[in-house]
Amino acid sequence: MDLSMLRAKLHRLRVTEADLYYEGSITIDEELLDAAGLLPYEKVQVVNVNNGSRLETYTIPGEAGERTVCLNGPAARLAAPGDEVIVIAYAELTPSEAREHHPRVVHVDENNDVTKTRTLDVAKETDENLAPDGMEDVLIAEGPQS
């Protein structure tokens, strides 16, 4: 059985444009794609922090250095310029591959300039967050608890 694992994430990009009449996708500055290890035309999930919408599309490289983040086609209805979005790519991995996997997370500022890049260690996180009583598959989530 394969697991769907986080592969790369661009965290809190600021939408700069929305083009309803383009045929579809999300245009992202190619330097940002490179920073996260995302490829042109790779399938991604886009989560809008401002309104909670989620969509799947694919990436199109934008002009390097322009810091463009543009939702195209019908996706343009789900975000407006100024909205913050999280762009996520996943990989299908076997459990043994997943334990050796190192997802990349890129943080940006309000101008879509990279402020921090992290490479996560799945094996370390799994070992440190195992639930008691041998429940290896139950991880404790970080962040505020309700």
Curated annotation (Swiss-Prot):
| GO function term, MF aspect, one | aspartate 1-decarboxylase activity
Name the cofactor(s) required for activity, per the record.
pyruvate
Task: Give the principal location in a single coarse category.
Answer: cytoplasm
Write out the GO cellular component annotations. Answer: cytosol
Q: Where in the cell is it found?
A: Cytoplasm
Q: Which UniProt keywords apply?
A: Autocatalytic cleavage, Cytoplasm, Decarboxylase, Lyase, Pantothenate biosynthesis, Pyruvate, Schiff base, Zymogen
> EC top class, in one word?
lyase
Q: Which residues form the signal peptide?
A: none
Entry note: cofactor: Binds 1 pyruvoyl group covalently per subunit.
Does the keyword field hold Cytoplasm? yes
Q: Where is the active site?
A: 25, 58
| UniProt pathway | Cofactor biosynthesis; (R)-pantothenate biosynthesis; beta-alanine from L-aspartate: step 1/1
Give the modified residues of type Pyruvic acid (Ser).
25
Q: What is its EC number?
A: 4.1.1.11
Q: Which family does it belong to?
A: Belongs to the PanD family.
Q: Which HAMAP family match?
A: PanD (MF_00446)
Q: How does it assemble?
A: Heterooctamer of four alpha and four beta subunits.
Please describe what this protein does: Catalyzes the pyruvoyl-dependent decarboxylation of aspartate to produce beta-alanine.
User: Mind telling me what this protein is named?
Assistant: Aspartate 1-decarboxylase
Source species of the chain = Salinibacter ruber (strain DSM 13855 / M31)
